[in-house]
Amino acid sequence: MIKASVALSLLVICGGVSAISVSSPFEKSCRQHPQLVGKCSTVHGTLSVYNGNPAVRLRRIGTKRILGVSDQRFKLPEYSNIPEALMKQLNGENELVGDFLVCPFTRSKPGEMQLICIESAKNVVTRKRA
């Protein structure tokens, strides 16, 4: 009886793990998104959470330019518009500074927030928001 319970428990646990790992590869990266309007490029900036839409924004360091991570208009269920690891690090009290590989959903226009997705990030430092 105990052996059967242990075996059943292991089967349930292993089945749950394989279900999680099987679903992950199906999420496509930002760079593969079908609605991109240009090439991806690296932006050295500060990623923060704001009140409003889009909530996650990337401010290019040395400029007043703000890029918005699309979370509605260009959100498709099978694509990731921002790496989950970055989202886990962000909250209203901190910001991330680093080099972000971004891909554009809209063209850059003066006075308008350009909508993007983030493919990856390097040299990321978390700091308290000022």
Question: Where do the model's predicted regions map?
Answer:
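OB-fold/S1-family single-stranded nucleic acid-binding modules
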Residues: 105-130
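Sequence contexts marking disulfide-bonded cysteines in secreted/extracellular proteins
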Residues: 29-31, 41, 102-104, 116-118
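N-terminal secretory signal peptides
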Residues: 20-79
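Sec-dependent N-terminal signal peptides
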Residues: 5-13
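Intrinsically disordered, low-complexity, charged/polar segments
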Residues: 78-86, 119-124
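Flexible glycine-rich surface loops and low-complexity tracts that mediate binding to linear polymers
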Residues: 83-111
